[in-house]
Amino acid sequence: SNMLNQLFCDFLQEVIDQYGVIVKHGDYVEYCNVESVYYDNAETVLGNSIRNAVEKRFPWMIVRKAKKASIIDRIRCTVRLMGAGRFWITEDCKSLQTAFSDAVWNKDVKDKDERLDDGSTDIDSLDAFEYTIERDMRDLIEEVEDV
């Protein structure tokens, strides 16, 4: 757990170094756009451990359980953002690019749309991405409809 906490905090530092906008006064962080982390709520013990490690190193950051909104709602939101030209993936995010490219519907389910989750594609990267936007889906979709 300590090694995982260290790796996770190092990853957060890389994200902040690459994409962060920070306003600091000495050691005090007044503002940082990297402000929230969401974890799969099935991993409560791991989530609590990561929360404690993050709070020590990045005291302004909030660590929460993912809401785990309906998968189809998360997919539809992402598709709408893509269709409206409001979705971008950075070049250094190859795993997410591949996950989007490889994602397919489960052909064995006939009465509804269901993403295939049998280990043949990287659903974990899609879930992780979707957890970052799911709390803002309503606002993001409203903005798409206003375009």
Language-model-derived ranges and their functions:
Residues 1-116, 139-140:
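Mg2+-dependent endonuclease catalytic cores in nucleic-acid-processing enzymes, primarily RNase H-like
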Residues 35-38, 126-133:
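Phosphate/NTP-binding elements of NTP-utilizing enzymes
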Residues 134-147:
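Acidic two-metal-ion nuclease catalytic site recognized across multiple nuclease folds
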